[in-house]
Amino acid sequence: MNESLEPVSGSFVTEPVRAATTRVFLALAPPDDAKDELARALGPAYAAHPRMRWNRIEDWHITLAFLGELPVTAVPPLRPPLTGLAARRAPLRLALQGGGHFDERVLWSGITGDLEELHSLAAEVRAVVRECGVHFPERVFRPHLTLARSRRGDQAATVEAAAGLAGFAGRAWVAGRLYLVGSNVGRGPGPIRYRTIEAWDLGRGTEPA
């Protein structure tokens, strides 16, 4: 995603996939004002830990299903069933809340709100993808928004940054779009870049990304 992940007024550009394979995931995303609110809360951590590998704010997202590296030919068959799924699912009311870490290496913010519906959506997304014959790693769905990763030997920074988010409670917002996203993870030493392959309005079917 070279443009920001916005569920309401995002300006994602659908780009052709030029490689033989692409790394793919399905996600929701908070709107700009919710991201700005969290970014302000992260101000002290940004200042104290500049060496952490901070994700770009415009790329913040909530992963529903990580499909891994797929042949580009496996992507088009996903579009029709995901269109149908999005059309029958209602938007979700969510909020960003608190913070934590995975193994003192990955910093994240938590998700609250319509969690039962969020888990249901993630389960249905994964089932639809598998019905298309796409096999991907089975991971327990733990709703979160990844913010940063620690440098080797600097795990204390992640723990400290997570503690700084303990009291954060963001405003509620509506997750109204489902995103099919490609990334360049593992394709060189540069920063991770994302692009939207397609996006669908929940409850209203598909429209151009």
Regions found by a protein language model. Give the residues of each.
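Histidine-dependent nucleotide/RNA phosphoesterase domain, centered on the 2H-phosphoesterase fold
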Residues: 2-209
